[in-house]
Amino acid sequence: MIFFKKKKKIGLAGWWGGRNEGDRYILKILKRSFGRDFDLDVINIPFRGDPSMIGYLNKLDFLIIGGGGLFTINFPEPFDTYDEWGKSLKTPFGFLGVGVQEVNERLSGTFASIIEKSTFFSVRDTGSYEISKKYSDKADKIFDLTFLSPRKITTSGNDRTMGVNLRVWNFDDRRTYDNSAWCHAINGLKQPKIKIPLSFLHGIDDRKAMEGIASGYSRTFSMGLYKKIGLMLGMRLHSLVFAVQNNIPPIGISYTPKIQRFFDDMNLQEFCLGINDHDKLSSLVERVNNDKKRIGPVLDGYNDHAHRAVARYIDNVVETIKNL
């Protein structure tokens, strides 16, 4: 008689419901990485930390949270109230390739508790690591999870055409982002442009943010759009990540720290613009176009290092969960 060992059931919790192409691809990678060895349940963040949800989580053998941005100025539900329900959670959990923007004083104790209770806690950039390691030596630095399986396509070598991604970011009085000024600066560039939207959620639809740009566009996302470009200007992190994975030089607009951190980790800090630096765009585009021979090897090295690091870490996570 042959006995089959029952697979452990693990939950994959993340930003899966936001119609964001970066998050969608992260989930695809997680399913591919863990689906062979485990049964998977997909869980959308945010979710409530009420007794019924905790009861559901306690039926899992393990809970993976991430990747992607998670700990921003305000933690998403239910991690903002972890101190209230954390002791009721019996299932072991770990954080995989997340971003930590900042930890305000009100949530510092909560954040410390979360890391200490985690089986593992890995972040996607050095800035997130520098914050996290102040709270626990469990913190590990890896890279964005999409580097496990880069979205490589065959580019056409059209160096003159620039891909553009803007996002809605002017819905808060505290934010100084001027969408119209960026559209004006982009329209002033002589080279051809293609709009590349990554997020389609109502209220923060990238297509809305790029209405003021006079260029070709797509109503949907496709990696095929990257075949047509030789330079990428982006706000959304994964618009830039997908360019880097195809050795396309990036220019970032740092609307949150994660964008600047991405460029810092590549040692390409000079190619990331501040949120109000639209007046510097034209000169920076010219600089990138003149510096592509230097940038190419930098991107190659980063891609290789990131892929190896994420692959090694996920292999270790699989073995860790198996052995619990």
Report each predicted region and the residues it spans.
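Active-site anion-handling motifs in enzyme catalytic cores
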Residues: 1-324
